[in-house]
Amino acid sequence: VWWDADEQRVLELGTFPSFMQFSKAVKLDMVCKVKTVACEWIESYGMAVGQEVFRTVAGIGWLAGTIGTEVRLVPRKAVKMHLCQSMRAKDANIRQALIDRFGVVGTKKAPGPLFGVSSHYWAALAVAVYAAETPVKDGEFWIEDLRKRSII
């Protein structure tokens, strides 16, 4: 989700089924022009995780190394607290909080500021809004900072 914090509206939505398709996409140029990319960071809840989680973490690292701009890793807990003031918030609560704040999604003939947002884009939009509205906090990381420390 490309979010314009000044105009408070979605500029673009995009899904890439693979890392290679992302790197070849025209939208990569758009991503490289932004100052910061915010990504939801994977958190441990003490449960066993599957291959999908490891692929996601690898993908975040790949993205950070590819785009050449700052990457802010945002924990989901922080997004929940910012938008819903509750750690128990679910996806439906986050979606409703975004609609309450920015207005209806709208239709093709009368698009709202969130027009086109559906499914997993709600979570991505929540991360983008959080990153645009808050300073970096403990528990969040900047990939740039890690590069400077030679961890990545």
PLM region descriptions:
Residues 1-152:
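Phosphate- and other anionic-substrate recognition elements at nucleic-acid/protein interfaces
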